[in-house]
């Protein structure tokens, strides 16, 4: 029988096989194994890579520019790849200037190969300098010319994204922080300098591609949507969960984003392009929806879930709202447990609806339809697939952060002092919860 072959860095390699004979290792001879036939995936055009991001936060590249080198695991067999970058200016947080972008790609250890944009070496992401006049039309979606393969499931693609602005500041290009476990890091310099860089700064906010596209036979490709709590931490809990489960995903985190924004005119701006290449959504929103009250939050969620279903989303996964009340050392308090306690009670009850409208928590009306729920103790309570979240579910990711179930009160060790934001330790705890939720649901 011929020896087995393993796929490494784009090549099939026949490993040496030895046997222990008389206390010595002896190589076993044999004929080389033929490389298995390459069969590209047959399926819809999807994002097939991990570690993607929509770009809408400020980058400060300096006068010469700055590049970020990121790593992305591929989850499809592909003859070629099409990379894309989605620019969504957020002028309220400094992302105001038009930003020049160049990019390169390689296999680990290889040479950087330049990517082109309709044959050109660079392209531009549109900025905008006024939050008051920003409209959903102020967006940029750029796609590189195809990058040739072939590529196998499990291969790693390294991408270097270089950005610059005329002033060296206020550019558009950051989504998520550089992660040493997944990325190479950042380096400043001209295009000629960054492609020969030997060392990178593996910290701070980084620029990354938004999609790696190819036909895919994967069960799901995910769009992740969040607010500042998806931007601020070194590793958001969504990144932890989806990276750990080896799922293709695109993270879109925007300071101040609410479910109400998606229910209004900003659906296409924030999610529309991703949903051309993703069939599933995970939402960590709700922090910025509290001002709408319980009924308003329910209406926003139901509107967004209906939009998702109309857009062809197979599953919407909704996380419960993070705590909103804190008891300080010495007895002081901040925030308010409501409407967090009430909206989470409704979500934990499967977000019951009757004829498309929110039903009371705990209703026993036989016409009520509930979503699948994953409880605080990892019990899966099956719901009705006709519920607006479709094949998705509601995941209780809040219990691990609050002092007791339904208290909406931050555990002291996770309180970031403003009741809205939370950082690395809390995200790590939630990330473990999300990993288990995804596993329980077959992902």
Predicted regions and their residues:
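Active-site-proximal beta-strand/loop segments in catalytic clefts of secreted hydrolases
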Residues: 162, 225-229, 251-257, 283-289, ...
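Glycine-rich phosphate-binding loop signature in dinucleotide/nucleotide-binding domains
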Residues: 151, 274-277, 441
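Structural alpha-beta junctions
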Residues: 243-250, 306-315, 353-358
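Catalytic His-Asp segment of secreted/periplasmic serine-dependent ester chemistry enzymes
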Residues: 324-443
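N-terminal secretory targeting modules
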Residues: 1-2, 6-225, 231
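Viral virion structural and adsorption modules
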Residues: 1-33, 268-273, 278, 302-316, ...
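Conserved acidic residues
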Residues: 155, 279-281, 314, 373, ...
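Conserved SGNH/GDSL esterase-like catalytic core that processes O-acyl groups on lipids
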Residues: 86, 118, 210-212, 218-306, ...
């Amino acid at each position: 029988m011929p020896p087995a072959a393993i796929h490494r860095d784009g090549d099939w390699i026949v490993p040496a096989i030895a046997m222990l004979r008389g206390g010595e290792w002896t190589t076993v001879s044999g004929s080389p194994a033929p490389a298995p036939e390459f069969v590209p995936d047959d399926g819809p055009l999807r994002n097939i890579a991990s570690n993607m991001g929509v770009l809408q936060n400020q980058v400060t590249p300096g006068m010469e520019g700055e590049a970020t080198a990121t790593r992305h695991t591929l989850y499809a067999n592909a003859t070629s790849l099409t990379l894309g970058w989605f620019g969504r200016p957020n002028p309220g947080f400094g992302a105001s200037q038009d930003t020049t972008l160049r990019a390169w790609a390689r296999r680990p250890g290889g040479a950087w190969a330049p990517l082109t944009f309709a044959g050109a070496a660079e392209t531009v992401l549109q900025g905008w300098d006024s939050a008051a006049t920003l409209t959903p039309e102020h967006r940029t979606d750029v796609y590189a010319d195809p990058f040739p393969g072939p590529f196998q499931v499990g291969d790693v693609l390294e991408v270097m994204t270089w950005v610059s602005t005329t002033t060296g500041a206020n550019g558009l290009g950051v989504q998520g922080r550089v992660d040493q476990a997944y990325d190479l890091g950042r380096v400043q310099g001209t295009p000629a300098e960054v492609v020969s860089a030997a060392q990178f700064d593996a910290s701070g906010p980084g620029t990354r591609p938004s999609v790696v596209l190819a036909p895919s036979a994967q069960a799901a490709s995910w769009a992740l949507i969040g607010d500042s709590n998806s931007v601020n931490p070194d590793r958001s809990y969504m990144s932890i969960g989806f990276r750990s489960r080896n799922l293709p995903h695109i993270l879109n985190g925007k300071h101040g984003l609410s479910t109400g924004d998606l229910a209004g005119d900003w659906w296409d701006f924030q999610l529309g392009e991703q949903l051309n290449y993703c069939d599933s959504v995970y939402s960590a929103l709700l922090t910025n929806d509290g001002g709408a009250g319980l009924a308003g939050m329910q209406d926003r969620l139901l509107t967004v879930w209906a939009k998702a279903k109309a857009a062809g989303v197979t599953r919407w996964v909704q996380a419960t709202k993070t705590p909103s009340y804190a008891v300080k050392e010495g007895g002081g308090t901040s925030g308010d447990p409501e409407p967090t306690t009430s909206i989470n009670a409704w979500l934990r009850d499967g977000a019951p609806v009757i004829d498309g409208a929110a039903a009371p928590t705990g209703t026993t009306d036989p016409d009520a339809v509930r979503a699948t729920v994953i409880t605080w103790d990892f019990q899966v309570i099956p719901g009705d697939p006709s519920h607006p979240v479709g094949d998705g579910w509601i995941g209780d990711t809040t219990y691990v952060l609050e002092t007791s179930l339904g208290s909406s009160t931050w555990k002291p060790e996770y309180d970031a002092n403003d009741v809205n934001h939370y950082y690395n330790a809390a995200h790590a705890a939630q990330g473990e919860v999300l990993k288990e939720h995804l596993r329980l649901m077959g992902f």
